[in-house]
Amino acid sequence: MNFTIPAPFTAIHTIFDLAFTTSLDTMLGTIQEAVSAPLVACVTLWIIVQGILVMRGEIDTRGGITRVITVTVVVALVVGQANYHDYVVSVFEETIPNFIQQFSGSGLPLQTIPAQLDTMFALTQAAFQRIASEIGPMNDQDILAFQGAQWVFYGTLWSAFGIYDAVGILTKVLLAIGPLILTGYIFDRTRDIAAKWIGQLITYGLLLLLLNLVATIVILTEATALTLMLGVITLAGTTAAKIIGLYELDMFFLTGDALIVALPAIAGNIGGSYWSGATQSANSLYRRFAQVDRR
């Protein structure tokens, strides 16, 4: 029996997107319910204490009011599910993608990338099957060369798809843990964690912009050239020439794939997020511990 998926990229994208969306939405609601009651109680007590200290003159009035406003805004986002969705989730899942779509350099909607990859996959599958039927069962050299060209081509498609799909899924994961991370913004010691979380979301937003500008152009160019190149390859005189043509096709797709694979590093460097390498050096850590010792 031959089990095949007619549109593998679209099917995989739909399955993972639905699974993560359902699970993470449930987890987000659970997190907000768990932290809302103790957080509101602690913040209420903290505001009362702040008011007493301000009235006694032990805390600067302007600074105390600023802290109260900041804490109130953070708590409103963390506790209120509608507020968090309207002001945080919708910005990164709806507003930014819709805004970025207006700057597409190819006119190809980013959401159609799985369908474009499915079309290219189907076209090459037909060509691969025709060429495979011409190779004799005892011709080990041609079989090995053909399989190598086939797997390289599949690898280029899957790597481009993996980057595209990972951006959406990881953004959903970050947004799901947002209430816990934003709670840390209230405290000075954990404020850096919340800042890094925001930086990571900004990085994914930049990566989405780069994908929309670069990946759509690359994939549209590859889809346009693929039909012509497959026609030339299948009309070649010998099987060896067809296999060589497949490797030339791989080189073309690897060039475009290199541009797409480089996009996460570019977005990380621009966004200045934690995973892009913004870690402390050994000298920086040494200076920090030295300051602690002197105190």
Curated annotation (Swiss-Prot):
Stretches that traverse the bilayer: 35-55, 68-88, 167-187, 201-221, 226-246, 251-271
Keyword Transmembrane helix: yes
GO cellular component: membrane; type IV secretion system complex
Domain of life: Bacteria
Entry keyword annotation includes Lyase: no
Major localization class: membrane
InterPro entries xrefs: Conjugal_tfr_TrbL/VirB6 (IPR007688)
Gene Ontology biological process terms in this record: protein secretion by the type IV secretion system
Keywords noted in UniProt: Crown gall tumor, Membrane, Plasmid, Transmembrane, Transmembrane helix
Location in the cell: Membrane
Membrane topology: Multi-pass membrane protein
UniProt similarity note: Belongs to the TrbL/VirB6 family.
Role noted for this protein: VirB proteins are suggested to act at the bacterial surface and there play an important role in directing T-DNA transfer to plant cells.
Protein name: Protein VirB6
Source species: Agrobacterium fabrum (strain C58 / ATCC 33970)
